[in-house]
Curated annotation (Swiss-Prot):
Involved in fusion and/or binding to host membrane: annotated span: 152-158, 237-244
Designated name of the protein: Envelope glycoprotein B
Keyword list, A-Z: Disulfide bond, Glycoprotein, Host cell membrane, Host endosome, Host Golgi apparatus, Host membrane, Host-virus interaction, Membrane, Signal, Transmembrane, Transmembrane helix, Viral attachment to host cell, Viral envelope protein, Virion, Virus entry into host cell
Region Hydrophobic membrane proximal region: start-end pairs: 697-749
Pfam families recorded: Glycoprot_B_PH1, Glycoprot_B_PH2, Glycoprotein_B, HCMVantigenic_N
Basic and acidic residues: bias regions: 878-887
GO cellular component, one term: host cell endosome membrane
Leader sequence residues: 1-24
Site (Cleavage): R460, S461
Superkingdom classification of source: Viruses
Low complexity: bias regions: 41-62
Sites carrying sugar chains: 68, 73, 85, 208, 281, 286, 302, 341, 383, 405, 409, 417, 447, 452, 456, 466, 555, 586
Length: 907
């Protein structure tokens, strides 16, 4: 009982002492504590917004309780503790666990240098040849006769061209020889059809004579044409008849022909294709192809041909071997040459003075930085004596020697003989290895000192069993694969070197890190092993090995960190790490400990040290840190504001340098265009040049042709010879009628013709009016119109036998006029009808008419007669009316014609 009382007294005293110390501490550091408390809550609240859920829960609990409230089951108040952070590692106790798994650190780590792929690299000079895709070009001569038949129909003023037919025929061989020796052609052509000989003459002359060749006006750069006639001839036939004429033109065309390897045929610019090798000479049929009719093929050695077909008496040239091929429309001739002398399968492409050859398992890689390309080839060399290399062998060796003399003669020596390789793309590489003179001297010195050396490098020979012949594969047109290979090889070498450095640095870093971990584990094995395994682990040394166990987890929300690190019982002593209180899971008993690294709780609070003033200590807890100044909590610090120790090992990796790829053009556009035997451009130019020769005289051609004439001609032609003759007759008659109608219509359409028709119409109207008025006067005054001489100039009637002037007498009465009209003599008229004269008989009437006719003839003769003395007309002598000229001349003076003396006597 006494012991219990004693214990209670001791506890009460301890509480009084603690409360007194707390009051004195709060009174001496009231301002600082208050500021620290406010800063702590502010920082904790700010950090809780970006922290984990557990932190927010702890902060809320701290805020919900009062500052002076006592923590459950402790003598501490909530103002004496701060919140916690469990972001990375949870709070745990690792010192209580017993190790069950044993581990140790490796000590004998050996880092070996990573070696790249074993490659045999050689330096040298490279000359590259490509396949020659340009077709073999040579000259050919084409002999032709052009027969042009034209049919026309002639109208009166127009000629209709009914049609034209052009036929190309081949001259006979005897005429070909005459053309080649004299530049002349005959003006006729004969053909046998079904046993009948048909002959055509130029201009229908029916005379066979020679015509001189002359240059055509239409030629181009690749073809030259010689003709005998430049203008097409046609003659107009008779009117309303058909006419068909013949125009014969001899034509010799010297044009270009192309043949592509393997030279089985060739094609000309005129569009002709000959299935014969241009190198076939009659004896090399196994090497040269022949696919034409052998009966029409001729070869003449030492054949003479004029040098210029367009010049008379031109000099003759002798050709070694000339071939002739007869066809239905032409004769083609060319000179036979030796294939080896005029063709070559290879042509120079590029040269690289700095080339690296790397040896792979089954191939060689020829890399050129200048060409930004890598070419692959088999290890088997091409036989230097291959016949395909004859045309380029000397040229390639000379180029290699020239490059060596220019760039390497002073510092390098040739290493080995010239070797030839064929790449996968069909290219041919001439390779000359080189090596520095200093290295060559060292090799020679080593060979002299080591007599037992059996693995000396020997020169490669092309005469060995590994030599092959050049294949007939075609060269590729695109070298993208070579540039891709160069890129891959460059990247491969760079990446391999980088990986080797990375692997070596990685091994060294692992070895160093392991040694550091081993030494640090002696201080805090749990922290080191937790960092290695990235999870909380309890570890302790068990001799020279480590024992591993899992840590004991605690209630995360019960952990509280004390603000004060001073030891109350021992003035001048301070805790080396902050004191924490916590509860184990499923327990309400409050435990004391100290905050370790990575939120590890160290059991007990015996870790103290002498207080050092001033003092600054920072303890990491998750993503934040507790800052204690003079062993009192001041604030929470974000870890990102504290710099870290840079312990990274530098890795020596250089960035890739820029590489500008060259645009490699294996074959130019000209070579690609020349590789085809058919050049469309030249063919069209040749066609247009010949088309311009076919021209017509437009003033002699009327288009369109009347459809009825064309239909009638077709109809009658289908009836045979008789129908054709009838058609010609009908066409002549119908053509005449049509010509007249067409002429009238054309005349009416002409402005001059229309004006003439208008004038004719006006003249017809005037004539009609004059005839009408004359007939009307004739009806009203028949005597005055029929016998104009009975009327005097003053309008009175003239009567013969009367001497008395009646102009002054009064006119007779009506009765007298009627009576006197029937009287024959003077005397008073009779008023009785019985006294009238007897009727005239027919004979008397007839005699009267005859007398009237004689009188009329005499009077008209007198009017039309002329006086031989003075030249005046008879009408003027007899006192007729003045003529029109006299009246116009004297119209203002009142001119009147006076009577002659004869007239006065008669009166």
């Amino acid at each position: 009982m006494e012991s219990r009382i004693w214990c209670l007294v001791v506890c009460v005293n301890l509480c009084i002492v603690c409360l007194g110390a707390a009051v004195s501490s709060s009174s001496t550091r009231g301002t600082s504590a208050t500021h620290s408390h406010h800063s702590s809550h502010t920082t904790s609240a700010a950090h809780s917004r970006s922290g984990s859920v557990s932190q927010r829960v702890t902060s809320s609990q701290t805020v919900s309780h009062g500052v002076n409230e006592t923590i459950y089951n402790t003598t501490l108040k909530y103002g004496d503790v701060v919140g916690v952070n469990t972001t990375k590692y949870p709070y745990r106790v690792c010192s209580m666990a017993q190790g069950t798994d044993l581990i140790r650190f490796e000590r004998n780590i050996v880092c070996t240098s990573m070696k790249p792929i074993n490659e045999d690299l050689d330096e040298g000079i490279m000359v590259v040849y490509k396949r020659n895709i340009v077709a073999h070009t040579f000259k050919v001569r084409v002999y032709q006769k052009v027969l042009t038949f034209r049919r026309s129909y002639a109208y009166i003023h127009t000629t209709y061209l009914l049609g034209s037919n052009t036929e190309y025929v081949a001259p006979p061989m005897w005429e070909i020889h005459h053309i080649n020796s004299h530049s002349q052609c005959y003006s006729s052509y004969s053909r046998v059809i079904a046993g009948t000989v048909f002959v055509a003459y130029h201009r229908d002359s029916y005379e066979n004579k020679t015509m001189q060749l002359m240059p055509d006006d239409y030629s181009n750069t690749h073809s030259t044409r010689y003709v005998t006639v430049k203008d097409q001839w046609h003659s107009r036939g008779s009117t309303w008849l058909y006419r068909e004429t013949c125009n014969l033109n001899c034509m010799v065309t010297i044009t270009t022909a192309r043949s592509k390897y393997p030279y089985h045929f060739f094609a000309t610019s005129t569009g002709d294709v000959v299935d014969i090798s241009p190198f076939y000479n009659g004896t090399n049929r196994n090497a040269s192809y022949f696919g034409e009719n052998a009966d029409k093929f001729f070869i003449f050695p030492n054949y003479t041909i004029v040098s210029d077909f367009g010049r008379p008496n031109s000099a003759l040239e002798t050709h070694r071997l000339v071939a002739f091929l007869e066809r239905a429309d032409s004769v083609i001739s060319w000179d036979i040459q030796d294939e080896k002398n005029v063709t070559c399968q290879l042509t120079f492409w590029e040269a690289s003075e700095r080339t690296i050859r790397s040896e792979a398992e089954d191939s060689y890689h020829f890399s050129s930085a200048k060409m930004t390309a890598t070419f692959l080839s088999k290890k088997q060399e091409v036989n230097m004596s291959d016949s395909a290399l004859d045309c380029v062998r000397d040229e390639a060796i000379n180029k290699l020697q020239q490059i060596f003399n220019t760039s390497y003669n002073q510092t390098y020596e040739k290493y080995g003989n010239v070797s030839v390789f064929e790449t996968t793309g069909g290219l041919v590489v001439f390779w000359q290895g080189i090596k520095q003179k200093s290295l060559v001297e060292l090799e020679r010195l080593a060979n002299r000192s080591s007599l037992n050396l059996t693995h000396n490098r020997t020169k490669r020979s092309t005469d060995g069993n590994n030599a092959t012949h050049l294949s007939n594969m075609e060269s590729v047109h695109n070298l993208v694969y070579a540039q891709l290979q160069f890129t891959y090889d460059t990247l491969r070498g760079y990446i391999n070197r980088a990986l080797a450095q990375i692997a070596e640095a990685w091994c060294v870093d692992q070895r160093r890190t392991l040694e550091v971990f081993k030494e640090l584990s002696k201080i805090n094995p749990s922290a080191i092993l937790s960092a290695i395994y990235n999870k909380p682990i309890a570890a302790r040394f068990m001799g020279d090995v480590l024992g591993l166990a899992s840590c004991v987890t605690i209630n995360q929300t019960s952990v509280k960190v004390l603000r004060d690190m001073n030891v109350k019982e021992s003035p001048g002593r301070c805790y080396s790490r902050p004191v924490v209180i916590f509860n184990f899971a499923n327990s309400s008993y409050v435990q004391y400990g100290q905050l370790g690294e990575d939120n590890e709780i160290l059991l007990g609070n015996h870790r103290t040290e002498e207080c050092q003033l001033p003092s600054l200590k920072i303890f990491i807890a998750g993503n934040s840190a507790y800052e204690y100044v003079d062993y009192l909590f001041k604030r929470m610090i974000d870890l990102s504001s504290i710099s870290t120790v840079d312990s990274m090992i530098a890795l020596d990796i250089d960035p890739l340098e820029n590489t500008d790829f060259r645009v490699l053009e294996l074959y130019s556009q000209k070579e690609l265009r020349s590789s085809n035997v058919f050049d469309l451009e030249e063919i069209m130019r040749e066609f247009n040049s010949y088309k311009q020769r076919v021209k017509y005289v437009e003033d002699k051609v009327v288009d369109p042709l009347p459809p009825y004439l064309k239909g009638l001609d077709d109809l009658m032609s289908g009836l045979g010879a008789a129908g054709k003759a009838v058609g010609v007759a009908i066409g002549a008659v119908g053509g005449a009628v049509a010509s007249v109608v067409e002429g009238v219509a054309t005349f009416l359409k002409n402005p001059f013709g229309a004006f003439t028709i208008i004038l004719v119409a006006i003249a017809v109207v005037i004539i009609t009016y004059l005839i009408y008025t004359r007939q009307r006067r004739l009806c009203t005054q028949p005597l005055q119109n029929l016998f104009p001489y009975l009327v005097s100039a003053d309008g009175t009637t003239v009567t013969s036998g009367s001497t008395k002037d009646t102009s002054l007498q009064a006119p007779p009465s009506y009765e007298e006029s009627v009576y006197n009209s029937g009287r024959k003599g003077p005397g008073p008229p009779s008023s009785d009808a019985s006294t009238a004269a007897p009727p005239y008989t027919n004979e008397q009437a007839y005699q009267m008419l005859l007398a009237l006719a004689r009188l009329d003839a005499e009077q008209r003769a007198q009017q039309n007669g002329t006086d031989s003395l003075d030249g005046r007309t008879g009408t003027q002598d007899k006192g007729q009316k003045p003529n029109l000229l006299d009246r116009l001349r004297h119209r203002k003076n009142g001119y009147r014609h006076l009577k002659d003396s004869d007239e006065e006597e008669n009166v």
